[in-house]
């Protein structure tokens, strides 16, 4: 009887295990079916209205056709990194479902984004505005002091390089205005770069792209060596090197290659935190050592002269998604990438959420999900662009399993949004997937198309 009871118990366990396995298989099958349905709905939506981002020239403001991010709020606006990322998505759409005629038509608008900005760029000082709208005028866009506030993010060369690379290396359309692009990069190198550390910094917190990132938001002027900015600048210098090569400008190739290598060294030295296993922004707001004597306790005294400060900056241990841009930019070493992903990205207490990557660690005191505009909220909500950049970085280092999980989170996010609201939003609640603000937003949300192409085993269009 004892053996019979044991046999019955084993049988019950096997049945329970089989039922559990079947339930898991059933749930997995239902999720696969939902993912397929969401991919189909997303593609249908985006393929049908991508031309809604095309805009025609309008007198003085826009000399060339261009791409607007989409939605009523941004209907006639050319934004720096917005139009660049929208174009990365557009390139995927064109590859997926159009022919040569549609691609030729789109190229005029794509190149126009770059050329419009260069039309506003001073060849003498390289100042380039970050935004152009229907009321802009090239002669009225400069601030009184161009070195006291931010300008266009370092991404225009990457936009141009994308188009050149996607069109068989043809850079002739850019040759005449390339000196203006060089002046723009020279402005950054001379006036936005901290000499002691080699890191680039924001002049202030105006329109930095990640509006209220605590590493820059309400910080002293010229104090934030943002990891976001430095990763973008590293890629920008590589893009300049590529474009100069396509134009046969070998001295410029050598210059940008040298600047890129110097920046890579600086970021690895000053922004990598061995303790936490990730990249952070750096704080430049340190008092200089003057060596001048003051009167202390009634006597001349040089404070700290025995061992003055010998470090140029302090690391900012603020858990922001932009630290993962070191994966996207190729700055992290393979060993660093392992720690960044295993110890930081995949931690559900901090960044890894049901609908993507939180833009600020949930453990930071500033974490919140307020639906704000001016500034837009980057202190926790999930954004399509941060999801995409982290995903792209994962693929750079061979984290395909994790990249697939993140892509599926993003597909679920947008698929459910289309089901419930019939449109996409600018940013989202990381736990529920609810759209928080700006319904009808297109722009970089369309980068989910690039994720879908990869998931489905098709050619994936990549940013430069």
Residue ranges and their predicted role:
Residues 15, 19-30:
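Bacterial Sec-dependent signal peptides at the C-terminal "C-region" and cleavage site
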Residues 26-78, 112, 116, 266, ...:
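Low-complexity, Ser/Thr/Pro/Gly-enriched N-terminal "stalk/linker" regions
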Residues 31-45, 99-119, 170-189, 236, ...:
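Extended, well-ordered alpha-helical scaffold segments
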Residues 33-43, 128-129, 190-204, 232-336, ...:
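Catalytic cores of carbohydrate-active enzymes
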Residues 51-73, 121-141, 190-218, 269-289, ...:
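Glycine- and aromatic-rich loop/turn segments at beta-sheet edges
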Residues 64-84, 107, 138-153, 215-231, ...:
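Solvent-exposed loop and edge beta-strand segments that line ligand/cofactor-binding
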Residues 76-200, 227-230, 234, 319-320, ...:
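Aromatic-rich carbohydrate-recognition surfaces in CAZymes
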Residues 342-353, 359-365, 372, 376, ...:
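Non-catalytic C-terminal accessory modules of carbohydrate-active enzymes
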């Amino acid at each position: 009887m004892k053996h019979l009871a044991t046999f019955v118990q084993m049988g019950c366990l096997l049945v329970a295990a089989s039922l559990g396995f079947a339930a898991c298989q059933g749930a997995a099958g239902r999720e696969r079916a939902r993912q397929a349905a969401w991919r189909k709905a997303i593609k249908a939506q985006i393929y049908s209205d991508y031309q809604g981002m095309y805009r025609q020239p309008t007198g003085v403001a826009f000399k060339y056709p261009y791409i607007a991010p989409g939605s009523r709020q941004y209907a006639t606006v050319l934004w720096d990194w917005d139009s660049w990322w929208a174009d990365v998505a557009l390139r995927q759409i064109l590859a997926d479902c159009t022919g040569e005629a549609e691609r030729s038509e789109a190229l005029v608008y794509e190149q126009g984004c770059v050329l419009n900005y260069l039309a506003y760029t001073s060849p003498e000082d390289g100042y380039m505005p970050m935004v152009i709208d229907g009321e802009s005028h090239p002669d009225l866009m400069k601030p009184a002091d161009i070195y006291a506030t931010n300008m266009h993010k370092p991404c225009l060369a990457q936009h141009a390089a994308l188009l050149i690379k996607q069109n068989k290396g043809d850079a002739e359309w850019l040759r005449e205005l390339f000196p203006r692009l060089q002046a723009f990069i020279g402005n950054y190198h001379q006036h936005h770069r901290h000499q002691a550390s080699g890191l680039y910094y924001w002049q202030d917190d105006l329109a930095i792209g990640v509006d209220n990132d605590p590493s820059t938001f309400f910080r002293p002027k010229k104090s934030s060596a943002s990891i976001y900015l430095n990763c973008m600048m590293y890629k920008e210098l590589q893009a300049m090197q590529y474009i100069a090569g396509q134009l046969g400008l070998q001295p410029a190739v050598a210059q940008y290659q040298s600047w890129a290598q110097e920046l890579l060294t600086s970021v690895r030295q000053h922004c990598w935190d061995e303790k936490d296993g990730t990249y952070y922004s750096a704080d430049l707001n340190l008092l200089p050592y003057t060596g001048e004597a003051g009167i202390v306790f009634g006597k001349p005294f040089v404070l700290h002269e025995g061992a003055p400060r010998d470090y140029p900056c302090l690391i900012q241990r603020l858990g922001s998604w932009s630290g993962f841009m070191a994966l996207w930019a190729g700055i992290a070493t393979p060993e660093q990438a392992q720690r960044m992903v295993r110890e930081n990205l995949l931690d559900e207490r901090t960044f890894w959420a049901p609908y993507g990557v939180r833009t600020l660690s949930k453990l930071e005191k500033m974490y919140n999900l307020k639906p704000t505009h001016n500034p837009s909220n980057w202190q926790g909500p999930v954004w399509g662009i941060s999801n995409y950049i982290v995903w792209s970085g994962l693929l750079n280092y061979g984290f395909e399993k994790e990249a697939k999980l993140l892509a599926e989170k993003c597909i679920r996010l947008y698929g459910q949004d289309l089901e419930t609201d019939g449109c996409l939003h600018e940013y989202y609640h990381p736990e529920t997937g609810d759209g928080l603000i700006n319904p009808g937003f297109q722009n970089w949300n369309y980068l989910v198309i690039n994720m879908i192409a990869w998931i489905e085993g098709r050619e994936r269009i990549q940013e430069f």
